[in-house]
């Protein structure tokens, strides 16, 4: 069975955000606005997305 994936796109800037949230974006592999990455849909990744949900858009 194929692993589930989720597409995450950064839609807001990380300038002026908490250092922890900037680090979370880097951990997700996001570098700039409109940058999209495809990640495995795991509890760890979902937790990171939840932490920076105000800066990202999630599909899938």
Swiss-Prot record:
GO cellular component: cytosolic large ribosomal subunit
Molecular-function annotations in GO: structural constituent of ribosome
InterPro entries, A to Z: Ribo_uL30_ferredoxin-like_sf, Ribosomal_uL30_bac-type, Ribosomal_uL30_CS, Ribosomal_uL30_ferredoxin-like
The keyword Ribonucleoprotein is annotated on this UniProt entry: yes
Keyword Nuclease annotated: no
Family matches, as SUPFAM superfamilies: Ribosomal protein L30p/L7e
UniProt-listed PROSITE patterns: RIBOSOMAL_L30
Top-rank lineage group of the source organism: Bacteria
Alphabetical UniProt keywords: Ribonucleoprotein, Ribosomal protein
Alphabetical GO biological process terms: translation
Assembly information from the UniProt record: Part of the 50S ribosomal subunit.
Family to which this protein belongs: Belongs to the universal ribosomal protein uL30 family.
NCBIfam families found in the cross-reference section: rpmD_bact
Protein name: Large ribosomal subunit protein uL30
Source organism phylogeny: Bacteria, Pseudomonadati, Pseudomonadota, Gammaproteobacteria, Alteromonadales
Name of the gene encoding the protein in the UniProt record: rpmD
């Amino acid at each position: 069975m194929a692993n589930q994936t989720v597409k995450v796109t950064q839609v807001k800037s990380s300038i002026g955000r908490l250092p922890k949230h900037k680090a979370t974006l880097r951990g997700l592999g996001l570098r700039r606005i409109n940058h999209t990455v495809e990640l495995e849909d795991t509890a760890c990744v979902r937790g990171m997305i939840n932490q920076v949900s105000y800066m990202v858009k999630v599909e899938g």
